[in-house]
Curated annotation (Swiss-Prot):
InterPro entries associated with the record: RNR_inhibitor
Higher taxonomy: Eukaryota, Fungi, Dikarya, Ascomycota, Taphrinomycotina
GO MF term list: ribonucleoside-diphosphate reductase inhibitor activity
Family (UniProt): Belongs to the DIF1/spd1 family.
Organism (species): Schizosaccharomyces pombe (strain 972 / ATCC 24843)
Main location: cytoplasm
Protein name: S-phase delaying protein 2
Domain of life: Eukaryota
Length: 102
């Protein structure tokens, strides 16, 4: 028999849960930043302001997208992984000192 415990909406989460959620959020943000740096190294021409706008495949479908918008809003979506780097980044992401390393 399973029971579900529901916290009242106005109550704060326990400290342990708050800490865990904060840690997960921080790690996700750091992983996106790391992936974005990796993306810039792999595709440097995508991140230059003088890039031909037709070079970006997303912009062929929507000419209103500007390169600056893509840099900011689609940073997470523009991460292109290769298989060797995926494991390396996953390993570094799992290390306890990951947040201090970059």
């Amino acid at each position: 028999m399973s029971e579900t415990f529901k916290l009242p909406d106005h109550d704060e989460l326990p400290q342990l849960v708050q800490t865990t959620l904060f840690d997960v959020g921080a790690r996700v943000r750091k992983a996106v930043q790391t992936g974005y740096k990796f993306d810039q190294q792999l595709f440097p021409s995508y991140h230059k302001d003088q890039t031909d706008r037709n070079e970006l495949p997303q912009q062929k479908h929507d000419p209103n997208l500007r390169l600056d918008d893509l840099k900011q809003e689609l940073a997470a979506d523009s991460i292109f992984w290769d298989t060797a780097s995926t494991q390396e980044i996953a390993d570094s992401f799992a290390k306890p000192d990951f947040l201090k390393s970059h």
